[in-house]
Amino acid sequence: MQESTMTERQALETAVLGGGCFWCTEAVFQQVQGVHSVVSGYAGGHLERPTYRAVCGGDTGHAEVVRVEFDPAVIPYREILDIFFATHDPTTLERQGNDIGPQYRSAVFAQSPEQFAEAGATIRALSAANVFDAPIVTEVVDASGGKVPFWQAEDEHQNYFRDHPAQGYCAFVISPKVAKFRERFAHRLQA
C-alpha cells in the first residue's frame, strides 16, 4: 500500500493559479475529477511568510492563489487551464468583480517550462478564438524550480466554501461560480 501511494504521488503534478479570491478558485477545483488536493495560499510577492492581512493591504506583491495537485493521466494541465480561464475573468487587471487590488490579479505560476508554454499557448488560442470581449491580462510567471515560492494561507482560509456555504460572500459570489462550473464541466466532476 505504501509503495503504491509513493508511485501515485510521483505521478501527480502541481498547478498554482490566481483567479481572484482564493475561496472561489479553491471551491471550483475541489470538485474536479483527478484533483487530489487544493490549498489556498499566496505567490508572486516579495514578503516571506505573508499573512492574509498583509496581502489584503495590497503592498506585498502577492496574489491570492491555489495550489492544485492533480493526476495528469486523469485531467491534463490544458484542461486545468480551461477550467481556470472559464471560471474567472482573465480580462480585468488586478480585480475580480468587486474584489479590487493586486492580490486579486489573474495569474498562472507555471511549475515547469512545459506549463509555461502551455499557459501561453492557451492564452493565444483563447485570444484567437475571441472567447472574451477584452484582451486577456493574465500574468504568466515562470515559477519552475521554486523560483516563486507558494505560501500556504492560514487555516481559516482552507476549505472556506465547504465550511461556510451560507456565509454571504459564499452564497452570492462563490455559489454561482461553482454552479456555472458544474454546468459547463459536468464531465469533469468528481464522482
UniProtKB/Swiss-Prot annotation:
GO terms for biological process: protein modification process. Signal peptide: none annotated. It comes from the Bacteria. Its EC number is 1.8.4.11. GO terms for molecular function: L-methionine:thioredoxin-disulfide S-oxidoreductase activity; peptide-methionine (S)-S-oxide reductase activity. Keywords: Oxidoreductase. The active site is at 21. It catalyses: L-methionyl-[protein] + [thioredoxin]-disulfide + H2O = L-methionyl-(S)-S-oxide-[protein] + [thioredoxin]-dithiol; [thioredoxin]-disulfide + L-methionine + H2O = L-methionine (S)-S-oxide + [thioredoxin]-dithiol. The keyword Transferase does not apply. Pfam families: PMSR. Has an important function as a repair enzyme for proteins that have been inactivated by oxidation. Catalyzes the reversible oxidation-reduction of methionine sulfoxide in proteins to methionine. HAMAP family: MsrA (MF_01401). Belongs to the MsrA Met sulfoxide reductase family. PANTHER family: PEPTIDE METHIONINE SULFOXIDE REDUCTASE (PTHR43774), PEPTIDE METHIONINE SULFOXIDE REDUCTASE MSRA 2 (PTHR43774:SF1). This is Peptide methionine sulfoxide reductase MsrA. It comes from Ralstonia nicotianae (strain ATCC BAA-1114 / GMI1000) (Ralstonia solanacearum). The lineage of its organism: Bacteria, Pseudomonadati, Pseudomonadota, Betaproteobacteria, Burkholderiales.
